[in-house]
Amino acid sequence: QTEHDPKKKTVLLYAHHDVQPVGDIDKWKTEPFTPQIIDGRLYGRGSGDNKAGVVTHYEVVKALKEDLPVNIKVFIEGEEEIGSPCMAEFLDEYQDDLEADVIVIADSGNIKIGTPTVTTSLRGLVDGVIVVEQPMRAVHSGLGGGVVPDAFMVLSKIIASFHNEKGELQIEGLTPSDMEVLELEEKDIKEIFGSKDINLFELDSISKRLWLEPALSILAIDAPSTDEAVNLLIPNAKAKVSLRLPPTENPEHAMKMLEEHIMKNIPWGAKVSFEPEAMGSGIVADPNKEFTKILVKNFEEVWENNAAYMGVGGSIPFANDFVEKFPNAELVLVGAADEEMGNAHAPNES
């Protein structure tokens, strides 16, 4: 941090240096940990999420170090991608050292290439594991098929209960957030998916569904691979489920609603349990506060383009820790990456 001047406001600059695993190496067109510039873009794991945030803060401080208009504190984390498990305890211990008037989290991004963007909301998150344990041993499908519901049948029915034929989430008791958002067009979201052929649900508003409403995804299923498949009825199966929450939804309430839905939709008297795991609140950042307005003005002058305000369908788990610990600080969510070609967490991140 810089030497403190009591006459100046204090800005805390946050980013994280840790990254996601590489994933399928065969889908990368460059070496993931060897930075490479192709057509003006930097490719490599962490190039956007979030080493770009670290470099952004470094360059800002370097450019202004001779005449800093504010006090600067820099906080670079190394556990964000595993949910920042030590963040709350760390903030408790170092609250006085990290106190600031403005907290700039450079872990978001831009809606389009060339459009400077401020993030005004983040969805919350709860997740957990559905566990099916039928009281039986594995039996040849020729001996038991059609007589008892095996674990895969049970799990499939529960998973199918989460959405209706229109793709609408069927978990009761969750309330969408109500706020004005930038309206995404169908072509925008197809660019993010990298396909013009992907079919979207019929929606009144893509942006509201993506940023302000709950959304459930099945992240993984424990099952034998098709290469190892044999004619057996399986007694045990698991599925990891992730429920994105509206920015203003209470995560404890949402976890309860998720579990209740699962328990109410157990078919055929099967033995099913739910193991809650991660839980985090969403965030709403007011774009009309002083620092954000100054930032947007400078964005537009430098980029020679109107700034955009967007929500983010994902979560930044630690952000709520900052909000709770520093309730009077202005929270600003920005980033160097973009939604069009960024590929955060995926192959060919740039």
Regions found by a protein language model. Give the residues of each.
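Acidic, glycine-rich active-site loops and adjacent beta-strand->loop/helix elements
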Residues: 17-19, 41, 75-84, 106-111, ...
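A generic structural motif
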Residues: 48, 136, 243-250, 280
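Active-site metal-coordination/substrate-binding segment of hydrolases
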Residues: 8-73, 342-345
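Acidic/histidine-rich catalytic neighborhood of metal-dependent amide-processing enzymes
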Residues: 46-121
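A short core secondary-structure module
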Residues: 89, 145-167
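Short beta-strand-to-loop junctions in surface cap/lid or active-site-entrance loops
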Residues: 1-7
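An extended, acidic, His-containing surface patch that forms the Zn2+-binding/catalytic region
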Residues: 20, 112-113, 169-228, 232-236, ...
